[in-house]
């Protein structure tokens, strides 16, 4: 296995300096900031990553305003009250990528977020309270309880 230091040095070399490399890295939020996030943001990010999987990301990004309009800014509460026939109508809206299987994940993941929030106060609090030394356990949870959040989709959404 290649040593981390070798990988790091190669990255520094490619970017020109440690400062330039570090400028490209994001700073993770602390638990307090994560806990303050609105649960609708999680649903939006899960949905974005589900749709980006298997598509050109630029296509999804270009249509994202349409997704937000069609799905009420990913309001968990509104999506939980949506009747099934309305979901079919929304899945055929030209403002979004019309992939019914992926559209079905939106209310399914809204339900998962709602269920977790009922037990933990909010989905954000659940994420903030998750032990940082068991991130793989969180990925497994999302895979098991979420819709299409296995593989890299769940981990990418948590970034």
Q: Locations of the language-model features?
A:
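Alpha-helical ds-nucleic-acid-binding substructure associated with the helix-hairpin-helix region
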Residues: 72-145
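N-terminal polyanion-binding entry modules of DNA glycosylases/AP lyases
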Residues: 1-96
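Short hydrophobic alpha-helical segments that form membrane-spanning helices or hydrophobic packing faces
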Residues: 154-159
């Amino acid at each position: 296995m290649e040593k981390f230091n070798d990988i790091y040095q190669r990255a520094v070399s490619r970017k020109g300096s440690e400062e330039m490399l570090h400028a490209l890295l994001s700073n993770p939020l602390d638990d307090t900031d994560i806990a303050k996030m609105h649960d609708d943001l999680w649903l939006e990010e899960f949905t974005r990553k589900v749709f980006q999987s298997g598509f050109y990301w630029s296509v999804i990004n270009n249509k994202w305003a349409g997704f937000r309009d069609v799905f009420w800014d990913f309001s968990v509460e509104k999506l939980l009250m949506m009747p099934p026939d309305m979901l079919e109508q929304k899945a055929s809206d030209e403002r979004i990528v019309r992939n019914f299987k992926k559209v079905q994940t939106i209310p399914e993941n809204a339900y998962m977020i709602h269920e977790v929030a009922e037990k933990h106060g909010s989905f954000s609090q659940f994420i903030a309270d998750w032990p940082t030394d068991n991130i793989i356990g969180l990925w497994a949870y999302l895979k098991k309880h979420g819709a299409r959040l296995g593989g890299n989709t769940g981990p990418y959404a948590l970034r």
